[in-house]
Amino acid sequence: MKISINSHSSIRIDNIYFDPFQIKRATHNAKYIFITHTHYDHMSLQDIDKVITLDTIIIAPQDAKQALEEKYQNKIIYVAPNDNISLSGIEVEVLPSYNIGKEFHKKSSAWVGYKIIYNESSFAVLGDTDNIPELAALNCDYLFVPIGGTYTMNSNEAATLTNKIKPKFVIPTHYGSIVGTKKDETDFVKKINKGISIKILL
């Protein structure tokens, strides 16, 4: 199993892609493309073009409908927080993803994160979110958590959430490109409790 982050929050697990962005080399091998929300750095059509095939299934929030259907003939599944769906080879739980006290990602937008069960492991990709109450009970093997601040939780808030969830592995995201720095990464790593393995992929 190969896990990588191309840039920012552009995550790949084998041929499963989340928010493809700044893709340097076209692969055209995506089985699934998951979109967390419609901001340009998370739903980039020019980057989707580089990984999509005729058989790719796209999973996205409802407000992505017009842009996706104007361009793609693929099967598209629209989801909302707390949905559960079954796909070939994976189970999907749709997570809420929003800001508290900030206007960038409103709860009313119904934007999402995803927890998938794949290859006998569970992976949680949180999207652009703060440390919201709904995530406190999350259970996963691999946690992809944003740490860059401004549009998401900051490194301290992300570490607090990670230590509460207690995943086997944590992978910090959403820094080093548009917002967030290597210092945020360093601060995050220092605050993670022993027993949680940290994977740095950016």
Question: Which residues does each predicted region cover?
Answer:
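Short, acidic/turn-prone active-site loops that include or flank metal/cofactor-
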Residues: Q22-I23, T38-Y40, D63-K65, A80-I85, ...
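Core dinuclear metal-dependent hydrolase active-site scaffold
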Residues: M1-H28, Y78-L138, M153, L202
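Binuclear metal-ion centers of metallo-dependent hydrolases, dominated by the metallo-beta-lactamase
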Residues: M1-S4, Y72-I85, A136, A159, ...
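Redox-cofactor binding/interface segments in oxidoreductases and associated redox assembly factors
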Residues: F34-I35, E93-S97, V145, P172
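Active-site metal-binding motif and surrounding structural segment of the metallo-beta-lactamase
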Residues: Q22-A67, N139-F144
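Active-site regions of enzymes building and remodeling cell-envelope glycoconjugates
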Residues: N29-H37, K71-P81, G89-V92, D141, ...
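Portal/gating segments that form or line small-molecule/metal binding sites
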Residues: I48-Q66, K71-I100, V112, T186
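Metallo-beta-lactamase
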Residues: K115-K168, P172-T181
